[in-house]
Amino acid sequence: MRVPGAVPACLLAVGVLLTGACAEGGDDGTLRVSGSTTVNPVAADAATALRDRQGMAITVDTQGGSAGGLAQLCSGEIDIAMSSKPVADSDRLRFPGCDYTPTRIGEDAVGVIVRREVYDGGVRSLRPDQVRGIVEARITNWSAVGGPDLDIFVYDKEPGRGTREVLDTYLYGDEAAPPPPDSDRFAIVGGNEETRTKLLSTPGAVGPLSTSFIEGYPGLAAVSLEGVEATPETIASGDYPMSRPLFLVTDGPARGAAKTFLDYVVSDAGQRLVARHGYLTLAQLAG
């Protein structure tokens, strides 16, 4: 899809800085995008492309993950929220006046990611009850689930992160997840990059993470869930139990620069960015 013509000039200096001609957005003409660290690589590349093509001024940030982005959207701080989860009832209750309008841009999988020595030591697949036991610190050594004699260290995502919500739904359904365990081998982390760094540096570590974020990192592996591996086919079919859609969300129908941005991401050029970062495209989901 060809993006519309150029817009007036302005200045910008925060976040992922893309300066040039101004798009409809904030008071200074800047289009502001924030939220999910999973969606961020696609949005950042799309912002760069639109800067190069028509000089739009755009910031892309990741404050607070998916829930943080949705809150900023409804507070009028940003124009587009990146979300790696559907808009939840809790989001609507928090901001009842917000007209959440999601645009799906692709599909991702959340994996239960372990260190390579755990995977090679025999932990290739886990059941939901085993994952629950691990994250609740009732299972504390990998030998209890067929792995090496190695203590488990859990890195869980902070509340409000899309990845955390996908894991909680898989493990607990509609029930509330229990509070974090009182354990010195459990820690809360934020974005995907931080999670990956912690997993790589901690023996016996495990945590939920987008499977695309471990591509090119041989020190990490995604275990199968109930015997189902996360592949393009199982993600598209929904057979993999922690598949999730990726969204760009606006407050009401997108207009002006926000519409230009959304149109680009769902265009052929934008979908190539989705594929580049390891996510399934809309065409792949359509079969």
Protein language model annotation of sequence segments:
Residues 22-67, 71-74, 78, 83-85, ...:
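Exported/periplasmic ABC-transporter solute-binding proteins
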